[in-house]
């Protein structure tokens, strides 16, 4: 007797079932995860709070990175005994009981270097190694050397690293690319996910999930062997992002997973803790106190979740675009995150096929197709003509255009006609003399106008090229590179972010001074230099005039062919 055709509810149930299979395959590994290191605000309790509130250091990150010289419980007991004694000096107590982080040696580049020479010379300067750390150090050890962004940062950061690795690959440092992939795989195996950075106080959240793209990058050099080698870690990271999905009812959210009323599964940013961030303790407390109409824990969670997004902070997350205390990151479903999840599912399908598991490859393809439909249905603003985030509170797509709207193009998830509209919107609303604006809002936050960030320039450039919009892509690359070159000519450094309303000016806003170095700017600059200059005539500095698209070199893409929506 012929079996009846499966009903629609059975088909919808396939999606959680696929994910559940991934969880089952990883259950043994999950049981081996060691105890999570405790962050300094938990280890030191009231002492940590008092030191940060006393503002002993200009940068709150300083004490978060300080290493206790003995058991933190003993230090805390001594503090409780001494703190109320006459003449107690908190700064002296800290100096005696902690080793404070040292400022790195200031790098002075040789005279007369071209932009390319300067970047190539920075790779060893930015390389760190922490195979072993002190027992109570907030720094988490990693087995291989890694490249830090630069400036105030002494640790590796998750999503920064992908764009840094693009530059390392462009410079031929495939050994460093392999080392960094191995480090992130180690973190997945050790902690169940890749934290924001290799610090104990970053373990409660991740960042934009680029690990699968890192493995795909390494596969350009090592072939499918890299995909097969790191398939278990990619699956485990996917399980982290989808954790809790099997118990979700329609209209519910659990940690990083959102299930809409029609069963569509999407993701959001989330931090497991709802306390002030140790590295920005005083600032977070002040933000929470400034809005007594909201529970402080809710604001702390949304601040932390915005840090997980990489966009800390932006009007993108706020109800009032000029008041940080109105941010509500956890009730927003980001278009860039879901584009990256789509890409992760596509790479998992490719890796599963390479490993000979066609059934699992088909499962991941099913998940990717379902997510793509969700992005097109819920994250396209037809009235405005651009992609945007989905609002869980209003149950509709938001109106604000941000550079995150280019991510569906970057991962080849956009419909062709919508990609064309995105090209128009980008040129009309975001393109500036110095590159691509992050948003059109001047809020004073660093992920808003007039700042432009290297990773978003590259995502936009690649995304537009994927859909044949090479002129707009060239405009973005050319404007941004000119900005980078002018700043380098004047200051002999590459910086974290740029003011794109002009050229030759570093960006402002944020919780700390402008940082130089700078990993992802170095990586994107090298990629763009090799994109705009012909292979037979590579350029070491940005050309004085805008190249024509005809003479520009189109690099081979590792992305899948553009799907039919």
From Swiss-Prot:
Highest taxon in the source lineage: Bacteria
Catalytic activity, per the record? Answer: alpha,alpha-trehalose + H2O = alpha-D-glucose + beta-D-glucose
Keyword Acetylation tagged: no
Subcellular localization is given as: Periplasm
Q: Where is the signal peptide?
A: 1-30
- Which keywords does this Swiss-Prot/TrEMBL entry list? Glycosidase, Hydrolase, Periplasm, Signal
HAMAP family on file: Peripl_trehalase
What family is this protein classified in?
Belongs to the glycosyl hydrolase 37 family.
Self-association or partners: how does it assemble? Answer: Monomer.
The name under which this protein is listed is Periplasmic trehalase
| The organism of origin for this protein | Escherichia coli O8 (strain IAI1)
Taxonomic lineage is: Bacteria, Pseudomonadati, Pseudomonadota, Gammaproteobacteria, Enterobacterales
In the UniProt record, the gene name given for this protein reads: treA
């Amino acid at each position: 007797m012929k079996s009846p055709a499966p009903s629609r509810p059975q088909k919808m149930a396939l999606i959680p079932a696929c994910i559940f299979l991934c969880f089952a395959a990883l259950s043994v590994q999950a049981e081996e995860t060691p105890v999570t290191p405790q962050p300094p605000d938990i280890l030191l309790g009231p002492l940590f709070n008092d030191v940060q509130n006393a503002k002993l250091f200009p940068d709150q990150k300083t004490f978060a990175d300080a290493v206790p010289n003995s058991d933190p419980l003993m230090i805390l007991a001594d503090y409780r005994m001494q703190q109320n004694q006459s003449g107690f000096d908190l700064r002296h107590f800290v100096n005696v009981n902690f080793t404070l982080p040292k400022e790195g040696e200031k790098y002075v580049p040789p005279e007369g270097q071209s932009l390319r020479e300067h970047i190539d010379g920075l790779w060893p300067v930015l390389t760190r190694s922490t195979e072993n750390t002190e027992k109570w150090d907030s720094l988490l050890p990693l087995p291989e050397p890694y490249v830090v962004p630069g400036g105030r940062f002494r640790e590796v950061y998750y999503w920064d690293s992908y764009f840094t690795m693009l530059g390392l690959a462009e410079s031929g440092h495939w050994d460093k690319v392999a080392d960094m992939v191995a480090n992130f795989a180690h973190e997945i195996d050790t902690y169940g996910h890749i934290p924001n950075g290799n610090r104990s106080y970053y373990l409660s959240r991740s960042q934009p999930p680029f690990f699968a793209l890192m493995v795909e990058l390494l596969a350009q050099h090592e072939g499918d062997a890299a995909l097969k080698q790191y398939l278990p870690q990619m699956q485990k990271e996917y399980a982290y992002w989808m954790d809790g999905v099997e118990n979700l009812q329609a209209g519910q959210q659990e940690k990083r997973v959102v299930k809409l009323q029609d069963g569509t599964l999407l993701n959001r940013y989330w931090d497991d803790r709802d306390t002030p961030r140790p590295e920005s303790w005083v600032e977070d407390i002040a933000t929470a106190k400034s809005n007594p109409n909201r529970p402080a824990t809710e604001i702390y969670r949304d601040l932390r979740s915005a840090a997980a997004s990489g966009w800390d902070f932006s009007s993108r997350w706020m109800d009032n675009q000029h008041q940080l205390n109105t941010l509500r990151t956890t009730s927003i479903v980001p278009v860039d995150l879901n584009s990256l999840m789509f890409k992760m599912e596509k790479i998992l399908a490719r890796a599963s096929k390479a490993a000979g598991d066609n059934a699992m490859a088909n499962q991941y393809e099913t998940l990717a197709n379902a997510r793509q439909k969700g992005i097109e249905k819920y994250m396209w603003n037809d009235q405005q003509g651009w992609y945007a985030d989905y609002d869980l509170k209003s149950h509709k797509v938001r109106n604000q255009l941000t550079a995150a709207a280019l991510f569906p193009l970057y991962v080849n998830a956009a419909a062709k006609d919508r990609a064309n509209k995105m090209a128009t919107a980008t040129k009309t609303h975001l393109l500036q003399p110095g590159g691509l604006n992050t948003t059109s809002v001047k809020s004073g936050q660093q992920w808003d106008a007039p700042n432009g960030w290297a990773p978003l320039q590259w995502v936009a450039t690649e995304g537009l090229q994927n859909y044949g919009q090479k002129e707009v892509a060239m405009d973005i690359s050319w404007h941004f590179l000119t900005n980078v070159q002018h700043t380098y000519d004047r200051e002999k450094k590459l910086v974290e972010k740029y003011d794109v309303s002009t050229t030759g000016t570093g960006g402002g806003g944020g919780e700390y001074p402008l940082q130089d170095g700078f990993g992802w700017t170095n990586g994107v600059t090298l990629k763009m230099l090799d994109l705009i200059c012909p292979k037979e005539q590579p350029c070491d500095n940005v050309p004085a005039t805008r190249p024509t698209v005809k003479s520009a070199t189109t690099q081979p893409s590792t992305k899948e062919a553009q799907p039919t929506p």
